[in-house]
Amino acid sequence: MNAQLPDVSVSQLPCNLSPLNWVGMQHIDLPTVIDTANQTVNTKVDVYVNLPKSSVKGIHMSRLYHLINHLSVLNTMSIKSVLKQMIDSHQDCGTTAAKIVFKFDLLLKRDAIVSTALSGWKSYPVIIEASIINELFNIEYKLDISYSSTCPCSAALSRQIIKNGFKADFSSQNLIPSADIEAWLEQYATLATPHSQRSIATVVVQPFDYAHDINFVDLIDSIENTLKTPTQTAVKRADEQAFAKLNGENLMFVEDAARRLKMLLDQKYKFWSAQVVHQESLHPHDAIAVAISS
């Protein structure tokens, strides 16, 4: 039936005879299974091939869509296979390169810090970008992880205010009963509080080899364990108190967070980058630091 329908991509030459670097489609909806997380996710897919032949008006988007629509499991092998098929399906266009981008949110169940049998779901945005260019396969993984950061400078300034308040109230006493100290702290220990904020670590990694798939859960866990203050889901007061303690024990400038991630990623990946953004509560702008593998 299609043979009887006009196809201007074949019958009409382009007015401007020139090759194109990438042509394709964006935001294709696709349910996929993430092997290493044992989870089905709603994925947005971008697909591209190059168009080297200037005599060809356009690519075959329906062929690309058909190939993507049959992709059900996301792992290195399946992604590499579909990239090869994308190139093979466009030999009449002279295609030598293909690129594919997967975007999805990975949902992980997270336990409360202290409370038993209390948990909630946390979303982690993930991007997988892979390509074959001149027969060379490349793949990288990008994740966003939210955490809390408390400013060390603000903490020091807050401590000074509390210290000065304590001295002002008790400077005339040589011996201070412990009950009086407890009562004072109960009322005035928050004369000043350090500013803290939700923060985002964006990590991009490439594995040492492509024989093994990235385990997203392991990577996320290692990043959160390194930063120490991941944002929480379900909490009770005991968990909120434990979270406050974690923040107090892990005061961080953006530089501190970036260096923590550098130490972690240097040990695990060949190529990587880490960007940390602290969405300042003190300022209307953000603080940012970036570290990249050498």
UniProtKB/Swiss-Prot annotation:
The keyword Hydrolase applies. One of its GO terms (molecular function) is GTP cyclohydrolase I activity. The record marks 151 as: May be catalytically important. It catalyses: GTP + H2O = 7,8-dihydroneopterin 3'-triphosphate + formate + H(+). It is an enzyme of class 3 (hydrolase). Keywords: Hydrolase. Coiled coil: none annotated. This is GTP cyclohydrolase FolE2. The lineage of its organism: Bacteria, Pseudomonadati, Pseudomonadota, Gammaproteobacteria, Moraxellales. The gene is folE2.
